UniProtKB/Swiss-Prot annotation:
GO terms of molecular function: identical protein binding; RNA binding
Top-level lineage group: Viruses
Quaternary context: Homodimer. Associates with the polymerase complex.
Function: P1 is the major inner capsid (core) protein of the polyhedral procapsid, which is responsible for genomic replication and transcription. Forms a dodecahedral shell from 60 asymmetric dimers. Binds to RNA and may be involved in genomic packaging.
Species annotation: Pseudomonas phage phi6 (Bacteriophage phi-6)
Compartments reported by the entry: Virion
Keywords linked to the UniProt accession: Capsid protein, Inner capsid protein, RNA-binding, T=2 icosahedral capsid protein, Transcription, Viral nucleoprotein, Virion
Name under which the protein is recorded: Major inner protein P1
Any matching Pfam family: P1
The keyword Ligase appears for this protein: no
Entry keyword RNA-binding: yes
Length: 769
């Protein structure tokens, strides 16, 4: 499906191997770093750049090809000094002296503007700072929409970037749908639930090594500080297998932060000026509470490695650490008292002038994952698909609603009331003003449970799998009973700590097939984010797959629902629903990947059932296929195609070579940005499984022809960009976000622009393949 040639890449760019950069988001939120091979030192880079600039000056190299090389440099952002690049770009007088027209074309292609006001013979006099600003605009920051399509994709996309802890005991999962085209509202879930676990993981981290890492990454955005802390915590967690010394953790954190940002830090340990001058670090340095406390501890006890009680750890150290790390984030942090609590960690973000309320909580019982829930509301009388109104619901109210989904391992709340009530065996009423509701939550128990002891004891017991004597005596080996006890305890604790919400006595309501469900009467002075088209969501999972539950009947918020009851006898842990309207069990996508290696054609087919057999559940493919996500991808796809068509038309009517090159540069930038996003999708979740299967089969074919050893996948690995792009397109088709015809049209446009060649120009792909 996606077959682009790499042969035509300019050979002079082969030295720039393994350079991978994806630019920066706004507010110094770095999402990538430049990875340089061992042989690619700055000395080599400078000599190569000088040689190529000399050739450009003599007119021997296509300025477009060399401009693409500069474009890759510019995308690196702070990882590779843009100032240094611009200095080299402007100081070589041979270029302007020998061929000013080539220089003008080169500048036009890089900046995307021919700038007719500057004459060709005066290009060399352009101030370096002006070109610097133009180069910085190349970092693709406007189209980060794939961070916001689905909760599943966000989880996998953020993991390799360090915003979440990959492969740890639990996974951060965040759901956020932004209003088009404001795709910058990344939820600050880096410091979500159970920070103590992350802190304890730092106990075995070599602080000197971490210091050296911070110092080496000094040119990067300050958000990488929390990224490295998270990565270090993950490494330490795997290394120590859960055996932590909390006191050593606190000492390590304070030592690291104190040495890095204390006013008394030796100059040689101080971060670079670039890092120090950013807003995040300025705020962090001004947070003297952490540093004063650190210095006082050293002064009083003579050393940083001190002993802290649990009370000190929970009431003083962790809040200090959270407060310090919050200054690195471009978003406002949750209140400390809510962040360190067990239930209802919330964040109030003022994004683009609009309030955005997020609740983050840990799914304790079934899956160690973090869920972020953003209440959103559409205009009921509008056909628009984008979320342009968010109700002003308080953090406390969101915190109270969170355990509702928490009980049944809900990754996020489902599409609308209809799905919840019909699929989850419950009933409910929401009055017309949206300020009062009666919700029926499923329980799968046969008798009521009285809260005759501390609810947190029950929660702790169920979290750890330890059932005390009283609970065991009441319901021996009764998993349903335990789940209900846990549910009741969580709800009781949540509402008891929230004066804004009043919950009546719960009661068991008989239902069909021996199942029961609870009824809670919840009322508040605030608007409740429940109702038709009011909540966008995710999935409720079960250990074994069930058939889809279709729902497509629009329900008005004022209606009273009596839901159908599911047979829960064989599903004791959670309920499974399909959170989308089109509930068909089949979908078509391009399942064949083809590639030419050494003039031989190889094709690998990847079927749906094979992907599911690898543990990739179908709902992980089709999770959250609401009209919102589909509308976003459609609008984004339309933007790319329409913009490319407009630029192509403008190029046909232009008579100025520099202006044509400027248009080519803009088209290339758009295409490269698009390809990187598609490739990113191809590296996540089910896309990675598709890549693995296709690679394995191509290896088998090559081995069968005697071209490689059975255990070698060398020749497949070098085509990783192409196969990841194919997988990304296939996943988008599986989700229904792109049709097969749209994907084919997209590949044609990208092929015409040679965007794939641009993506691989700075990697180790052999152009001879």
């Amino acid at each position: 499906m996606f077959n682009l040639k790499v042969k035509d890449l300019n050979g002079s760019a082969r030295g720039l191997t393994q350079a991978f950069a994806i630019g920066e988001l706004k507010n110094q939120l770095s999402v990538g770093a430049l990875q340089l091979p061992l042989q690619f030192t700055r000395t080599f880079s400078a000599s190569m750049t000088s040689e190529l600039l000399w050739e450009v000056g003599k007119g021997n190299i296509d300025p477009v090809m060399y401009a693409r090389l500069f474009f890759q440099y510019a995308q690196a952002g702070g990882a590779l000094s843009v100032d240094e690049l611009v200095n080299q770009f402007t100081e070589y007088h041979q270029s302007t002296a020998c061929n000013p027209e080539i220089w003008r074309k080169l500048t036009a292609y890089i900046t995307g503007s021919s700038n007719r006001a500057i004459k060709a013979d005066a290009v060399g006099k352009v101030p370096p700072t002006a070109i610097l600003e133009q180069l910085r605009t190349l970092a693709p920051s406007e189209h980060e929409l794939f961070h916001h399509i689905t909760t599943d994709f966000v989880c996998h996309v953020l993991s390799p970037l360090g915003f979440i802890l990959p492969d740890a005991a639990y996974v951060y999962r965040v759901g956020r749908t932004a209003t088009y085209p404001n795709f910058y509202a990344l939820v600050d879930c880096v410091r979500a639930s159970d920070l103590r676990r992350m802190l304890t993981a730092l106990s075995s981290v070599d602080s000197k090594m971490l210091q050296a890492t911070f110092k080496a990454k000094g040119a990067l955005a300050p958000a990488l500080i929390s990224q490295h802390l998270a990565n270090a915590a993950t490494t330490a967690f795997e290394r120590s297998r859960g055996n932590f010394d909390a006191n050593a953790v606190v000492s390590s954190v304070l030592t690291i932060l104190g040495r890095l940002w204390s006013p008394s830090t030796p100059k040689e340990l101080d971060p670079s000026a670039r890092l120090r001058n950013t807003n995040g670090i300025d705020q962090l340095r001004s947070n003297l509470a952490l540093f004063i406390a650190y210095q006082d501890m050293v002064k009083q006890r003579g050393r940083a490695e001190v002993i802290f009680s649990d009370e000190e750890l929970s009431s003083t150290i962790i809040p200090w650490f959270i407060e310090a790390m919050s200054e690195v984030s471009p978003f406002k942090l949750r209140p400390i008292n809510e962040t360190t609590s067990y239930i209802g960690q919330t964040s109030a973000i003022d994004h683009m002038g609009q309030p955005s309320h997020v609740v983050v909580y840990e799914d304790w019982q079934f899956a160690k994952e973090i869920t972020a829930f953003t209440p959103v509301k559409l205009a009921n009388n509008s056909n628009q698909r984008f979320l342009d109104v968010e109700p002003g619901i308080s953090d406390r109210m969101s915190a109270t609603l969170a355990p509702i989904g928490n009980t049944f391992a809900v990754s996020a709340f489902v599409k609308n009331r209809t799905a919840v009530y019909e699929a989850v065996s419950q009933r409910g009423t929401v009055n017309s003003n949206g300020a009062e509701m009666t919700l029926g939550f499923p329980s799968v128990v046969e008798r009521d449970y009285a809260l005759d002891r501390d609810p947190m004891v029950a929660i702790a017991a169920l979290r750890t799998g330890i059932v005390d004597e009283s609970l065991e005596a009441r319901a021996s080996n009764d998993l349903k009973r335990s789940m209900f006890n846990y549910y009741a305890a969580v709800m009781h604790y949540a509402v008891a700590h929230n004066p804004e919400v009043v919950v009546s006595e719960h009661q068991g309501v008989a239902a069909e097939q021996g199942s029961l469900y609870l009824v809670w009467n919840v009322r508040t002075e605030l608007r409740i984010p429940v109702g038709y088209n009011a909540i966008e969501g995710g999935s409720i999972r079960t250990p074994e797959p069930l058939e889809a539950i279709a729902y497509n009947k629009p329900i008005q918020p004022s209606e009273v629902l009596q839901a159908k009851v599911l047979d829960l006898a064989n599903h004791t842990t959670s309920i499974h629903i399909w959170p989308w309207h089109e509930a068909s069990t089949e979908f078509a996508y391009e399942d064949a990947y083809s590639v030419t290696i050494r003039n031989k054609r190889y094709t690998a087919e990847v079927k749906e059932f094979e992907l599911l057999g690898l543990g990739q559940r179908r709902e992980r493919v089709r999770i959250l296929k609401p009209t919102v996500a589909h509308a976003i991808i459609q609008m984004w796809y339309s933007w790319f195609v329409e913009d490319d068509r407009t630029l192509a038309a403008a190029r046909r009517t232009s008579r100025d070579d520099a202006e044509k090159l400027a248009i080519d540069g803009r088209r290339m930038q758009n295409a490269v940005t698009l390809l990187r996003k598609i490739e990113m999708i191809g590296t996540t979740g089910i896309g990675a499984s598709a890549v693995h299967l296709a690679q394995s089969r191509i290896v088998d074919q090559m081995a069968g022809r005697g071209l490689i050893d059975d255990s070698s996948d060398l020749h497949v690995g070098i085509n990783r960009h192409r196969i990841r792009i194919w997988a990304g397109l296939a996943v988008l088709q599986m989700m229904g976000l792109l049709s097969r015809s749209e994907a084919e049209a997209l590949t044609k446009v990208l092929g015409d622009s040679n965007a794939l060649g641009m993506v691989v120009a700075t990697t180790d792909i052999d152009p001879s393949l």
